[in-house]
Design a protein with these regions (language model features):
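Conserved nucleotide- and phosphate/pyrophosphate-binding catalytic cores
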Residues: 213-357
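A generic alpha-helix structural signal
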Residues: 9, 31, 103, 107, ...
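Short runs of predominantly hydrophobic/aromatic residues within well-ordered alpha helices
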Residues: 137, 171-184, 206, 254-257, ...
Length: 357
């Protein structure tokens, strides 16, 4: 059992989210006092979020369930640079029109999971271009740059790995840490946000923001990271033979989404039930105890619950019916969904069976 006093942190803990935190005791006290404000940043590199983003979305959902206020930060400014974290080469830059179109598409992905509005714990969505776009270069250097050392920045995993491999690491990318840290400072000032959530790959960037707030405002801020999710076979969460598993319905149908979760590997079912559903702990433990072919029952529950969260109960029920018809119907199959698989995708598939699951 977790030793956290905060119900928010206790739930994150038993569900298996928490990897690292700053100032654990102080963070717990802040969350336990009620109405904590926390943010997650999302760069607008595509017009939809994908399953890989669900980890942090679910963290915001749990925060709101326990009375906290979620802040979804759109990276209209930082996307102009591109997050270099865990990237082996520089990303191509997007135009402002592309970034704005992507932000418009991303907004719809949040709505099934968190409630937006003007209430004390209603979520808000903000765009860091509102301050980064107005920040002059000299002002940025004076306000932020003076608080960071090159010595520290080159020790970050992504920077060190690129330099060791003699891969280019542009000055543009080098500024990403400063910009993300400044985001935290602005959210602290504008919205009283004292906590940043993210994947473990963002740990260095989060620490930068926590430190900047302490140095410039004398304020107390916190960071919490979650484990990066991979399947038991080592595949990055949300990636399939056909590409990313998108959250927007126009990019991935409810049936495809349901089928993705139904095809979860046996060893991952319990973990994914904890991370990606609202099921209570006792029910999850019951499903985790299933053995043999009964694991398929747990997989169906996982597929139903995750699809219900994103697309609604009716869409989840229809997806289940379609999948069942595909398995057991002896009638015509013209009405079933069809998908084209390129030769390249076929060639990289670990097996034909993986494509036919």
């Amino acid at each position: 059992m977790s030793d956290y006093k905060s119900e928010f942190l206790r739930e994150l803990s038993w569900r298996g989210f928490i990897k690292d935190t700053t100032h654990k005791a102080e963070l717990d006290a802040y969350c336990a006092q009620g109405n904590p404000v926390a943010y997650v940043g999302y760069d607008a590199t595509a017009d939809s979020l994908h399953v890989g983003h669900l980890m942090t979305i679910m963290m915001l959902r749990i925060l709101q369930r326990h009375g906290g206020k979620p802040v979804a930060l759109m990276g209209g400014g930082t996307t102009r640079i591109g997050d270099p974290t865990d990237k082996e080469k520089t990303r191509p830059l997007l135009t402002d029109d592309q970034i704005n179109a992507n932000i418009a598409g991303i907004k719809t992905a949040f709505e099934p999971f968190i409630r937006f509005g003007a209430g004390p714990n209603d979520a808000i969505m903000v765009n860091n271009d509102d301050w980064l776009g107005k920040l002059g270069y000299v002002e940025m250097l004076r306000a932020v740059g003076m608080h960071f050392t090159i010595n520290t920045m080159v020790k970050q995993d992504t920077v060190a790995r690129r330099l060791a491999a003699e891969q280019p690491y542009s000055f543009l990318e080098f500024n990403y840490l400063l910009m993300q840290s400044y985001d935290f400072l602005e959210l602290f000032r504008r919205h009283g946000c004292r906590m940043q959530l993210g994947g473990s790959d963002q740990w260095g960037n989060i620490l930068g923001g926590v430190d900047l707030i302490h140095k410039t405002e004398g304020g107390e801020a916190f960071g919490l990271t979650a484990h990066l999710v991979t399947t038991s076979s080592g595949v990055k969460m949300g990636k399939t033979v056909g590409g990313a598993v998108w959250l927007n319905a126009d990019r991935k149908s409810p049936y495809e989404y349901w089928q993705f979760w139904r095809n979860t590997e046996d060893a991952d079912v319990g973990r994914f039930l904890r991370l990606f559903t609202d099921l209570k702990q006792d029910e999850i433990m019951r499903l985790e105890a299933l053995q043999g072919t009964q694991i398929n029952d747990a997989k169906k529950v996982l597929a139903d619950e995750t699809t219900k969260l994103l697309h609604g109960e009716i869409a989840a029920s229809e997806a289940y019916t379609t999948a069942t018809s595909a398995l057991y119907s002896v009638g015509p199959v013209e009405s079933l969904p069809t998908y084209e698989i390129s030769k390249g995708e076929w060639d990289i598939s670990p097996s034909t069976v993986a494509l036919l699951k």
